[in-house]
Design a protein with these regions (language model features):
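Helix-rich effector regions associated with P-loop NTPase G domains
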Residues: 1-166
């Protein structure tokens, strides 16, 4: 992700400029929203750390089990769900509250920080094929939402017209 403008020299007289992009006002691909939050592109107040960490783990467990095993010394990563993995990470990193309860918020912060700082390694959260699939389902959900909204507006308009005037 590009945070600052960069000038990359490709040849003596040929440069590539990498500049930060602009986020669209409404994210219709839910997974992209989680990925943007995990990467730090979305402000902290716009998401819940625990939810983002669970979504991140849900993706990383099947795709990068070796990275999780190496970083958190967890055996048989693939047998974990995102929730049990977060709990195991909390126990490994000492994110325990009084009474031995797991501090999920602290564990989530650890997972997100480790991802952003590349402590888990260089990981990719989406491929072009995955994004195309997510986009198709996001566009369909958005179209369905628009149809429901339109039907609701028509219903309200009809109800207002049918209401007797005094």
């Amino acid at each position: 992700m590009t945070k600052l403008e960069q000038r990359i020299t490709l040849a003596d007289d040929f440069y590539l400029y990498d500049t930060p992009g602009v986020l669209w006002p409404r994210i219709i691909v839910e997974k992209s929203g989680y990925n943007l939050a995990a990467s730090g592109a979305i402000g902290v107040n716009a998401f819940d750390d625990e939810e983002v960490a669970l979504e991140l783990l849900h993706y990383l467990i099947p795709k990068y089990p070796q990275a999780l095993a190496l970083r958190y010394k967890i055996k048989d990563v693939s047998s974990h769900t995102d929730e049990t993995m977060l709990e195991a990470i909390a126990r490994f990193r000492g994110a325990i509250q009084s009474g031995g309860r797991v501090n999920n918020t602290k564990a989530a912060e650890i997972v997100i920080h480790d991802f952003r700082s590349a402590a888990l390694g260089r990981l990719t959260l989406e491929t072009p094929a995955e994004f195309a699939e997510w986009l198709a389902s996001g566009l369909q959900a958005d179209a369905d939402r628009a149809l429901r909204k339109e039907a609701l507006q028509k219903e309200k308009k009809t109800a207002r017209k049918a209401k007797p005037k005094n």
